[in-house]
């Protein structure tokens, strides 16, 4: 049986800079997501001095902040975290949908 070739990206970035864009709304959930993101970056060898956290009011504002930050090219990777909790209104669908759409658009831009 022949071996299958496996190709992976470098999971231990050296000299890379990262930003975490996080919403302030629902901070009790978002703070745990930030902590998990920081832990993941640490486990992959990212220097703590190479990480910045940018807070925005809510999930709706995340795509705009990510877009502006990406255009500066001062970071190599951006992690976006926010929490929208489903309630009795359509607010959840609207906000989470717009956030996902905005991030998808940014991701497809060069």
Residue ranges of predicted features:
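Short gly/ser/thr-rich secondary-structure transition/capping motifs
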Residues: 1-5
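A generic local secondary-structure boundary/capping motif
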Residues: 6-10, 103-106
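Glycine-rich phosphate/diphosphate-binding loop of Rossmann-like nucleotide-binding domains
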Residues: 8-57
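Short coil/turn connectors at secondary-structure junctions
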Residues: 15-16, 48-49, 73-76, 109-110
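Short alpha-helical scaffold segments that flank and stabilize functional sites
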Residues: 39-40, 68-69, 110
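Arginine/glycine-rich "motif VI" loop of SF2 helicases in the C-terminal RecA-like domain
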Residues: 43-46, 104-110
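Glycine-rich phosphate-binding loop
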Residues: 61, 65-103, 107
